[in-house]
A protein has these predicted regions:
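Short, acidic (Asp/Glu-rich) active-site segment that either coordinates a divalent metal cofactor
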Residues: 1-49
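Glycine-/charge-enriched secondary-structure boundary and capping motifs
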Residues: 53, 58-143
């Protein structure tokens, strides 16, 4: 989460540097993941397919296009429920985390308020909790 947002910050910084001095080329070395997340976002159809394969039917699902906080609010309002969000459980890849720190931005703020990640936020029945735990253990995805 937050990778597209921090990718945008990086691209904007490099654009400003280039506009001030056209002889300096953008420095995007080692930042492929976050740049790609900004320039080529992809919907996570693979997650939907995986959930179907293991027999999980989410009660609610939304893509994270406006930031995690906004999407959590949408699900809570639509279901007339609340939630607890644990900061240490928010999936942040290391490049997003490190680049946010380089920019002096709290990485959690990137995940909560950045957008265009197109990851999926979903809820499942409590009875499917063990299946989700097993799925998490068998994949490198953040669930």
């Amino acid at each position: 989460m937050g990778a597209a947002y921090i990718g945008l910050q990086l691209l904007e910084r490099e654009k400003n540097i280039f506009l001030e001095n056209p002889n300096i080329q953008p420095d995007l070395e080692g930042k492929d993941y976050i740049v790609e997340r900004q320039l080529k976002p992809e919907a996570r159809r693979d997650i939907v397919e995986l959930l179907a394969e293991i027999g999980i039917k989410p009660n609610a699902m939304i893509d994270v296009s406006d930031g995690l906080a906004s999407e959590i609010i949408h699900i809570c309002e639509a279901s007339n429920k609340g939630c607890k969000l644990y900061e240490d459980k928010i999936p942040l890849d290391s490049m997003t985390y490190e680049t946010a720190r380089e920019f002096g931005i709290d990485p959690t703020v990137c995940a909560l308020n950045g957008g265009e990640d197109y990851e999926l936020l979903f809820t499942v029945p409590q009875s499917d909790y063990d299946k989700i735990k097993e799925m998490k253990m068998s994949t490198t995805w953040s669930i």
